[in-house]
């Protein structure tokens, strides 16, 4: 079946999004063209503007239109000496939604993966070490993902912190709230048992 080259191009472009296959891309393209052309134009404008204007914060490497993001430039965030290391800007968003952290961040944009050729310099650890040398941190909280690569990355950064006399901690991993023990995998359950907390009255 022959279709418009522009339509094919649109569907192919939509497939760059995570979880979008050929059928999903086709549905999206037809939806925009049939029922929501104004929404499609807004999407195109927002994408164009975001791709051309959003860069990385010079301090923490998250996404921002400014040289330094709003979190890093907030004096109250600078005072407590806490830095949370995460793998992606999406992790910042998740932590901010909890309302439990009032420090600053450092975004790795990935994790160490020697098999994929990703070393310390590829995830900005040189920049993090510079900050450890010149800034006064009370604690570095390692919030990398609970994967083999995430744990290896956290261990590497913890060693860097130790070399500079900065305390490093790892976020707790364990049974999710509302979860049932029989459904939890063995590794997660092991972490939960090792990180158990006493009752305080």
From Swiss-Prot:
Zinc finger regions, C4-type: 57-72
Gene Ontology biological process terms from the UniProt entry: DNA recombination; DNA repair
Stored Pfam families: RecR_C, RecR_HhH, RecR_ZnF, Toprim_4
Coiled-coil positions: none
Lineage top rank: taxon: Bacteria
InterPro entries referenced in this protein's UniProt entry, alphabetically: DNA_Rcmb_RecR (IPR000093), Rcmb_RecR (IPR023627), Rcmb_RecR_Znf (IPR015967), TOPRIM_dom (IPR006171), TOPRIM_RecR (IPR034137)
Annotated PANTHER family: RECOMBINATION PROTEIN RECR
Molecular function per GO: DNA binding; zinc ion binding
Protein name: Recombination protein RecR
Gene3D superfamilies attached to this UniProt entry: 3.30.60.80, 3.40.1360.10, 6.10.250.240, RecR Domain 1
Record function comment: May play a role in DNA repair. It seems to be involved in an RecBC-independent recombinational process of DNA repair. It may act with RecF and RecO.
